[in-house]
UniProtKB/Swiss-Prot annotation:
It comes from Geobacillus kaustophilus (strain HTA426). Part of the 50S ribosomal subunit. Contacts protein L32. HAMAP family: Ribosomal_bL17. One of its GO terms (cellular component) is cytosolic large ribosomal subunit. Belongs to the bacterial ribosomal protein bL17 family. The gene is rplQ. The lineage of its organism: Bacteria, Bacillati, Bacillota, Bacilli, Bacillales. This is Large ribosomal subunit protein bL17.
């Protein structure tokens, strides 16, 4: 299985992808580097597929990965609840391809290629 190391140790890489996945669930659109977005795409495919399954085991598997952050302060809904109640039903008839990556220009400081990744 090949993956991008993203210049980090295994635990740092997992933490980065957890943070990015949680942010993408909450905001539904984030700006990041191209390499991070391409790795995040496969993680989000798995999370949304778990959300579509919707059983207790899938919810626990997703809860083990997604951070416990508040997605909507008015309703008190957290990221996991948003994934299972709002995002997953949207893609019930779609077999994969839940995210879109749009290229931006290079980052000003170091020239890293930047993209916007969003839920379709």
């Amino acid at each position: 299985m090949s993956y991008r190391k993203l210049g980090r140790t295994t635990s740092q890489r997992k933490a980065l992808l957890r943070d990015l996945a949680t942010d993408l669930i909450i905001n539904e659109r984030i700006e990041t580097t191209e390499a991070r977005a391409k790795e995040l795409r496969s993680v989000m495919e798995k999370m949304i597929t778990l959300g579509k399954r919707g059983d207790l085991h899938a919810r626990r598997q997703a809860a083990a990965f997604i951070r416990k952050e508040v997605a909507n302060s008015e309703t008190g809904q957290d990221a996991l609840q948003k994934l299972f109640s709002d995002i997953a039903p949207r893609y019930q008839d779609r077999q994969g391809g839940y995210t879109r990556i749009m290229k931006l220009g290079p980052r000003r400081g170091d020239g890293a290629p930047m993209v916007i990744i969003e839920l379709v």
